[in-house]
From Swiss-Prot:
Domain of life: Bacteria
Catalytic activity, EC: 6.3.3.1
InterPro entries noted in UniProt: PurM-like_C_dom, PurM-like_C_sf, PurM-like_N, PurM-like_N_sf, PurM_cligase
Claim: Manganese is one of the keywords in the record: no
Localisation per UniProt entry: Cytoplasm
Name of protein: Phosphoribosylformylglycinamidine cyclo-ligase
Pfam families assigned: AIRS, AIRS_C
HAMAP family per record: AIRS
Pathway stated in the Swiss-Prot or TrEMBL entry: Purine metabolism; IMP biosynthesis via de novo pathway; 5-amino-1-(5-phospho-D-ribosyl)imidazole from N(2)-formyl-N(1)-(5-phospho-D-ribosyl)glycinamide: step 2/2
GO BP annotations listed: 'de novo' IMP biosynthetic process; adenine biosynthetic process
GO CC annotation: cytosol
NCBIfam families xrefs: purM
Amino acid sequence: MVSYKEAGVNIEEGYKSVDLIKKHASKTFTKGVLNNLGSFAGMFELPKYKNPVLVSGTDGVGTKLDIAFRMKKYNTVGIDCVAMCINDILCHGAKPLFFLDYIACGKLEAEVAAQLVEGVSNGCIQSECALIGGETAEMPGFYRDGEYDIAGFAVGIAEKDEIIDGSKIEDGDILIGIASSGPHSNGYSLIRKLVEDLHKDFEGNKIGNTLLTPTKIYVKPVMKLLEKYNIKGMAHVTGGGFYENIPRMFKEDFTAVINKKSYPLPNIFSHLISLGIEEDHMYNTFNMGIGFVLCVNEKDGENIIKDLIEMGEKGYKIGYVKKGDKSVELI
């Protein structure tokens, strides 16, 4: 007789991981959560909205995970997972409600799984949303030992008549960029080709640790700005960089004109250019120091930037909108 454990699935380790995970998830619970982890499904009571619309998004972390494997640092990529989902739904003005995660591995290590969920929990706390469920899948022979994948699913809410869909964007509106924390979770397949020694010094730190800096979550500053200003469009700068993501906020045919010298380029991107990536290709791959973009009336620009600074963020007027063909023009 062959046991499940002999087939590569350790049920006891699974029970241990669940116990470790529960304490991290419970820290994220908000008043809408109706049950604890361990049920067949998570339940969340919707707040009182006049005409509510649920806004959802799903994403993963990609090959940034390989940096985490090699550095044996597992408690930050969970933040990335949350950020990649939450920042997307934020683009439509949605307030995050709850999050679910999915972790897959070849051999389950409870302590590693707990570190992953610790990161997810921290990301949810930053996003002011609840981690109400998830799945940890142990699949022997499918993943190599020591490797795993993580993905997430976020749900937010917005009043129907307050959804931001780009329909109010006009010729002459300005673009405000909010600084990123680094490459975030995109471009790592290219980074891994160029950066072989992750323990090499970079500005007093191992470059592997620098590359594991978590993706910035923009919920708190953006939700505060939405209370005061007419924000017409928003873009989360992810894979595809400026060229692919900024036009996604446009409902009509506009061109985003971006001044590359309007903000300081972070050193990590200058370093990647020095390793042999063409600058134009960088803007089509990385966020280049700007992780989130707002489209607003020109008259609000200075005050928005002041408010961002007061909230501890770095904001810059990086360009403007003109009639065009849903494209980006760098100057």
